[in-house]
Amino acid sequence: KNNKKRNKVFKDVATTGKSTMGWFHGFKLHIVINDRGEILSFCVTQANVDDREPLKNESFLKAVFGKLFGDKGYISKELHKLLFVDGIELITNIKNNMKNSLMLLSDKILLRKRSVIETVNDELKNICQVEHSRHRSVTNFLSNLIAGIIAYQFLPKKPSIKFEHLNSSQLALY
């Protein structure tokens, strides 16, 4: 295959990155959602940018406080300290080679509900059509992405986590 003919539109902007699904060329959409599935913040980076980098950007997390749940890719002592100073507690699973640390039961339960973010990603791609491989300009790419995010925000039913604190030591999930 002749790769020189590929990726001309974004040749100076898009990069190649690796995800759990393999290699891809383009960009990454980073989103922060709340328990009701509403998008609080989003950021677009090149494909080769570390997933932790947007979390270091103050403007990306300005609407966020409290607990932030992420996957193992967000594990970083430095990032944990940086966010903690800003009033954000980063909660992730531990990697296999790490020491087990104590975690509140409610945090453990909520960490298992991370599939909600995957559902949001799926709805953005399949219902709101943000994943598109044939854009002919950066402007069209960004217009389509922002329109898709706006359309998602107007969806009547979003993936969510229904829970309430019964008292200081109990958590109810529905």
Locate the predicted segments by residue:
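Anion-binding and metal-coordination hotspots
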Residues: 67-69, 82-87, 146-174
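Polybasic low-complexity intrinsically disordered regions
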Residues: 1-96, 149
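Hydrophobic (often cysteine-bearing) scaffold residues that line and stabilize catalytic clefts
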Residues: 51, 113, 142, 146
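Short, solvent-exposed polar/charged micro-motifs at secondary-structure junctions
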Residues: 1-2, 101-102, 144-145
